[in-house]
Amino acid sequence: MVAIYELRTYTLHPGKINEAIDLYTNAGWPALEPFQKYLVGYFTGDIGALNQIVHLWKFGDDADRRAMWQEIYAIEGFMAFAAKFRPLIRIQENKLLLASPWGPHP
């Protein structure tokens, strides 16, 4: 079975990165922490594309991915976080990726 990776990139309105990081730290992460077994990592840009929060998730298959998000969307605390976070986003991009047959795979 080939793992599925979900790469989510949130490009924020200029000047909103610190507010977004505070929201994720205090409201987003507490709701998402129970699902960290799927999380490869969260990242912010330092050079190049700025004002971005990028996160990468790994799932056994698409059914696992859909089940996790369905469970997260049922968490009241996450939905309250999302309502505050969405206005900070200028562009949201989600990609589903398959691991290549060579090289290491996180």
Where are these regions (language model features)?
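An amphipathic, aromatic/His-enriched active-site/gating alpha helix that lines ligand/cofactor pockets
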Residues: 18-40, 49, 58-96, 102
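Basic/polar N-terminal segments that are highly enriched at the extreme N-terminus
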Residues: 1-2, 106
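Active-site-flanking beta-strand signature of metal-NTP-handling nucleotidyl enzymes
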Residues: 5-10, 54
